[in-house]
Amino acid sequence: MINKISRFKILLLFIFIISLTCAQDEELISTPEGYYDLKRFKRFQHYKNIQPNEEAGYTDLYYPDVCKNAIRNRDGAPTFNQRSFPGYTGVFDTLLITKGTNMTLDSTGFLTGLGIWSLLTLCVEGNLTVLYNPDEFSFVPVHRLVILPGGTITSHANSFLFWDTYQVDENFQEELNKRVKIDPFNFFPGLLVLGGNLNLFGNSQLTYTAKRLNDTTLELSTPFLNMKFLWNKYIITIFTESIPQGDDCLFNMDSDKRTFYLIKTNYGTCNPLRETDKLMKVVISYNRYEDNYSSYISLFSDYYGFEPNEASIFITGDSNVYIENYLIKNLGKTKNNAYSDTKLIFSPNNTSEVIGFINGTNQRFRSSLYIEFSNNVIIKNCVIIESSSETRSPLVFFGSNVYLSDNLISSKSGSSLIAQYGTENIQSINNFYFQKGVSHQTASQILNPINMDFGNEGNGIYSVSPNLLSSDDFFIGQNYSITFNFIANRSKITGFDQDCYAPCFSDSINFSNKIQYPVDFKIFNPKFLPTNNTNSDWYILNINDNGNQPGTYYTVKNLTTLDPVQFSLDNSALSFLGLEASENFKMNGNAKRLDIVNSIISSKALTNQQQIISKVSSSAISFKNSYIYSKLGQQITPIDNQIYGSLITPFYYNDSDILNQVKILSIFPNVPFQIVSGSILNVSINLQIISTADISCTFSSDNSTFSTTILVNPSDGSCVLPLVFEKEGYFNLKVTLKISTSKDYYYIVDFPKITVYNEYLFYSGWVMIDSSTDEFLFEGKIFKSGCQQQVLGNCTISTNSKFINGLPNVTETDELNRLFSSGITSINPYEPVTITIPIDKESKKNQIQLFFTHQPIDIEYSLLSIYVENQPIFLLEQLQSGLGSTFKNLTFNYENSKSLEIINISFTTRGDIYLTSMAVYSSAIPIIVTPTPTSTTSTPTPTSTTTSTPIPTTTPTTTPKTSKTTSKNKLKIALPICLFALLVAVGVLICFIFRKKKQKKQKLDNNMEDGSEMSSIKIKKENYNSFNKFKESTVFKNDDFKNYSNPTETTIYSTSDSLLNFVGSDFLNYSDPNIPLSFSKNILEFGLKGSKCDINTFLSDSLRITNNSNIILCICTVLPRNDSGEVNVSPDSFELDPNQSREIEFSLKLNCTTRFFERFAIEARHTHSFKSIHTHLFIHVESKISSKLDIKEIEVKELISQNNLSTVNIANYRGLQVVLRKIKTHSANYTKTYSQAIKKFYTEMDILSKLKNKNIVSFIGCTHDSSHLWIVTEYAPLGSLSSLIHQKKEKLSLIQKVKLMLDTAKGCEFLHSNDITNCNIKSNNLLLFSTMEKDDVCVKISDFGIKKFEVQNQNEKEIFKDEKDQKLIDVYEFGITFYETMLEETPENLSNLILEGERPTLDLEKLDADIRNIIERCWNQNKRSTFSEISISLKEKYTKLLEKNNELIQEN
C-alpha cells in the first residue's frame, strides 16, 4: 500500500514538473556561433481577453540571453558593491541581482571602485534602489541594463548612462571581444524591461516657462531654486518655435533667480533670442560637458565627447513604469524610414534552433522609450530629447495604458508620439511636443500599414487607437498635430483574434462577424505653433481610415481650435460636435458624410460659409444648429449641395456681443420638412431676450420675392408666421433678426429645406418574405411577395442577402405585424443589399416608402445608408433603439427623369436592420406624413408685408387647415419597442429565444414628432432647442447591460451608492427562459424615446407584468435611491394569479441636470414556500441642460484656495475641467429658514446662468449638500491676476496692465447694465486667459454676485460704511485693484486709510498721468466714475499705447 502511495506521489510530482515546464513563458533558442542565444518571450501573454494568432509573426519577442553566466550576488547582500558579487573581475562583468534580494547602491562609493567599462551588463531579478546623494551628482555607466520578470529598479535623482562597444579603448578591445557576442535585434546599448518595475524619481524641476527680455536675456516664470553648485555646473537649453530641438547656453543669474543672462558655450550655438517667438520653454540641467550630470538617462558618449550614438529603452511584459523629473536624451535607434526587421531562419527539424539570420537595417520599436502591454505607465514632468538624427518617434506605446503630463518632448522625427495597436487608453495632458520638421522626401514616403509601419509624416501624436485623450497639449512644428489612422479588423495585422476597437465583437449567434462601432475622439484645447520647417499646409487634426470597409461614424467632441483639420474617410461619416473654431480654421479632405453640430466657427479667412468646406469632398454635408461669424454687411450663401438625409440649420451672426442681448433657443422646422400643397405651416423662431430692445423678424425666401416682417412677441420671445404653400417644389426660407438699438448687427437664420408635394397614388407594394405565393392586403393596398434571389420577375434581390422569418411584433395590430414579420438583411455586415423593382415610367415623380425593423444586438448605434440607382438618399444615419426592437418608416422622393421601367434600391447595415416591406407611389398619392402645425396663443402683427408671388402666402390666423389627405389612403403604422433576443452560449449549443413585448401605439401620420421621418428627415428627431457647448460624451453605462450569473445574493446598483441586497433570492435575467414573469418592456423611457426632459417635471410610464407560471406570485417592486431624481411606483406590491397580467404605473421627476440610468428590481415570491427570484429592469431618462447640476457628476480635484468661508478647487464635470467654489451654508446672511435660503440661491444662480459676456466667466451650474453651496464655473488655465503678480512675480508691461484693466471694466460695465452689483472686484477674482495685449480676451471676472452668500468681513463693512450705492463700491474696488496692478503689490494698511478718509498714495505720483487720473476717479467720494466712462478712458489709453508700440516696431 505504501509503495502504491509513493508511486502515486512520484507520478503527481512528475506531472507537476511537466506542467511547470509547459507553462514557462520563456523558451531558450540556440543560435550560430558568435551570436547570443535567444529567449523566446510570449509578449502578448498579459493582453487579457484576446488570444493571439501564432502565425501572425508578432506574438513572440526574441531577445538576447545576455544574463547567461552572470555573476550572482551573495545571498542576503544588502549593498551593491564589489564584495557583494563573488568572482567580480572589474572588467566587462555581467552581474545578476537574484530574486528575493534587496540591494541599495550608493553610486558614489560604487563608482570609486569600478572602472568606466567595468559593468558590461546588469541584470535585476530582485530589487535595486539607487540612493540619492544631494552633495554630488553621480551616474551608473552600463552597456546593458535588463530588468527580468519580477525585478525592480528604483532610482532617486541619479543617472544611467549607456556606453557602446566601439567607444572602448583599444587596449581593452581584446578582452571585450571575449565577453561580447552579436545582438541580432539591436536592443543594446540600452534598457530592457521584461515584466518588472521601473521607478525613476528626479529630485528637482527640469522645465520652466520663460519670456524674452532681449537677445541674450530671459526671465523664468518661477525662480530657479534648485541650484546646488556653481553656475558653470549647469546648462540651460532653450526651446522655441525657431529652435524646436533646443539651444544650449551657459548663464549668469540675477539675485531673483529668475533673470538669466545667456553666455555662448564652446560646444553650442546659443543664438540670440528671437522676438517673433511666441512660446519659450527652457530646461535647466547639470552641465554634462563639465563634471556633473542632471537626473537623466543618456548615452555615455555625451560625457566623453564621442560622436552621438544611439541607445533605446524597451519595456514589455505588463511592467509598471513611473518616471518623474527625468531627462532622457540622445536615445532612439529606429530611423524614419521603412522598417527593416531582422528575421530568423529556423532549422527545419528543430523550432528551438536558429541556423541563420536575415539582418535588417532599421529594426522597429527601438525608440527612446518604447512600452508595450503595460497597464500602469505614468510619465510626468520629464524631458525627452532626440537631437542626433531623424528617427521614427521618441515615444511609442503598444497595448498599454499611459498617462503623460507636463512633459517636454523634442525630436526630429516622423511623430512625436505613436500610439500603436491596443493602446486604447492614453492620456496626454499639458505636454509640449517640439518637432523639427522631417524632410519632404521622408514625409511623402508610402509605408505599409499592414506591416504596422506608419507615422512618418511629421505628426505630433499619431494614433491607430481611438481612445486617446489630449487636453491642453502644445504642438510645435508638426505637419499634423494629431493624426488618427484607423485600420479595421486589426487581427489581420496583430494576430489577435477579435482585435478591433473595443468593444468590437458580438456574442450573437446571428452576428458572429466583428462589428466596427462608432468612435468618439476626446481632444480639448490643442495649441499649435508652426516653425520654419513646417509645411505650408499643416493641420491640427488629421483623420484617416485608409478607405476601410465597413465605414463607421467618427465624432470629434468639444474641439477648440485655431487651426485647420484634414480627413480622408471615403466610406465613413465624420461629425464635429461642439466645435469652437476660429483664426485659421478650415476643412480639407473627403468623407462620405460630414456633420457640424452645435458649433461656433469664426475664421479670419472666412468670407462665406461655403469656404469652410470648399476643399471637402462629401456626398452629404450638414450644418446643424451652428453659429457662423460673418463680416459686417456681408451676405453668407448657404451650402447648396445638401442631399436627402442631411440637415441644415445654421445660425449666422456678425459679432459675439450680440449674444449678450439675444440668443436663439429653437426654430421650427428644424429638420428638412415635407408638406402637402395647400396645408398650413407655422414657421417660428424662439428667442431668449435679455435686452429690452424691440426685435423684428423678416421672413424671406431665396427662390421667391416673398418677404414679411413682424415684431417678436415680448411675452414669449417668439416670431411665428403661418404660411400656406400652394405650389409643389422646394423652398429655402430664412429669417433676418434686427435689433432696433443696433441696426448694424443682425442674425440670419436659414431654415431647412421645405418640400411641398401634390397628392400621389399607390402604385405597388412589396413584402420581403421567402415565398412567391403570399400577398398581403392592407387598407385596400396589395403588398406582393415574390422578391427572390436570381429570379427575373417583378422584384429581384441580390444574392448576398438573407431572409429572416419570425421577426418580433413591433405593432399592436396583427394586420401590421404580418406585414413586418419577415425581412432581409445582408449576409456580411455593411455589404449593400440591392432590390430591383418595377416603377411607373410614365410618371416623372414618385415616392418610395421603406419599412424597416431594427432588432439591435447591443446598445451601440447602427448605421443605415440607402441608395437609389447608386445615388445616396440616406447616408450613415445612426439608429439606436436601446435593447428593444423598433419599427422605422423612411420615405423619399424619386424623380424618374430617364423614364426607367425598373430601379435599383440598395441599403447597407451592420446586419441588425431588416427591410420588411416597401411601397411605391406615383401620379397623385396622399402624403404619407402630415405635419402638425405649431399653434400659438396670439398672432404676431406684421409690420410690413410684400408678397410678389403666391408660393408661400401668409394667413390671417394660426388655426391649422385640415390636410386634404383622406384616411383610407393613409398608411397608419405604429412605432413601438419590441422584444429583444437574449443570446446565451453554452459550449457549442446556443439557444435564441424571443419573447413578445408590446408598447403604446404611436401612429406614423405625424412622423415629425414620433421619430419616423420622410425623405431627408432623420429617423430620430433632433431637438435643437438650445445651444450648449458642454455636450455629453456618453449616453449609456456599459454595466447596465452586463450578463449576470445566478447567485443567491445579488446587489442592485444605484448611482447614489445605495446597496440593496436580496437575501435568499435567486437572480434571473429578465429574458431568461426560466423566469416565470414576462414584461411589456425592459427599459422605461417615460415616453421620451431618446429625447431629453425638463427638470422638476413629472413624467409617467407603465409596465405590464405577466405571471407565466401556474402558481400565485407575490410581486414586489424595489426602486433605486437616487437624489438626482424621485421615482415612485403604484402599486409597489401585489399578488398576481397564474397566467394573469397587471399594469403598474411609474412616475419620475428629475431634480437636476442628470443622466438617470438606473436599475430597479422586480421580485417574485411564492406565496406558500416563500421561495423568491428577482430580476433587473432599467430606467433610462436624461434631462435637458439646466443651471442645477447633479453633485455626483462633479469630481473634485486639487485645492486652489480656501478660507473660513469657502474653498475653491479644480474639478471635472462631464469631461470638462472646471472651477468649483464651495460656500459654507451656516452663514450669518441666512436669516430665513434653510430651505428658503436654498431656494433663493438657485433662483439667483439661474439668473446668473443667463448672463453671457466674453469678459465674465461662464457659469456652468450649481448644486448643494448639507453644509455647502456648490458653484461651478469656467476654468482659467493661467490662474488669477493676483497669483501672476504676487506669487509668480511676472513683470507686466504698461500696455499689458491697461489691457487687463480694460477687459475688467468692460465686464463690470456689462454686469451693471444688467443690474448685477456686488461684483467682488479684486485681483484674486480676475482670471487670466491670456497676457498677450493684442488678444481679444485677456481677463474674465469671476465670483460676481456670489459675495452675498458669504459672511461679510467686519473690517470690510467698516470700510464701506458710508457707501450707499453698491455700484459705487464696485467702482471703488476696481480702483484699488487697478492701483495694486500698477504697483504689483497690495497696498498696506488699506482699511485704516479709508476709515480716515484717505486713499493710498504710495508711488501714485510715479504712475502715468492718464492712469493716475482714472484711479483717482474710481475712489473719488464726491463724483465717482461709472464703468462706461472708465471703459472709454481705458480704451483710448490702450489705443495710444498700441499705436506707440507699432511705431517703435516700424522704426526698428
From Swiss-Prot:
Residues 1194-1452 form the Protein kinase domain. It comes from the Eukaryota. The chain crosses the membrane at residues 973-993. InterPro entries: GDT_regulator, Ig-like_fold, Kinase-like_dom_sf, Prot_kinase_dom, Ser-Thr/Tyr_kinase_cat_dom, STKINASEGDT. Its main location: membrane. Residues 24-972 are extracellular. GO terms for cellular component: membrane. GO terms for molecular function: ATP binding; protein kinase activity. The protein kinase domain is predicted to be catalytically inactive. In the N-terminal section; belongs to the GDT family. This is Probable inactive serine/threonine-protein kinase gdt6. It comes from Dictyostelium discoideum.
